[in-house]
Curated annotation (Swiss-Prot):
Family recorded in the similarity comment: Belongs to the RecX family.
Biological function: Modulates RecA activity.
UniProtKB keywords: Cytoplasm
Protein name: Regulatory protein RecX
Any single GO CC term annotated in Swiss-Prot or TrEMBL for this entry: cytoplasm
Residues passing through the membrane, by range: none
Gene (name only): recX
């Protein structure tokens, strides 16, 4: 079976963006 590469890439991008947003919120709270 072949895994849908597009789906995994999209999921990885979403996780990366969510992590960036979380870190940004954390930094904003620290300031």
């Amino acid at each position: 079976m072949r895994q849908p590469i597009e789906k995994s890439l999209r999921q990885r991008a979403l996780e990366y963006l969510s992590k960036r947003e979380y870190s940004a919120v954390e930094l904003a709270q620290k300031l």
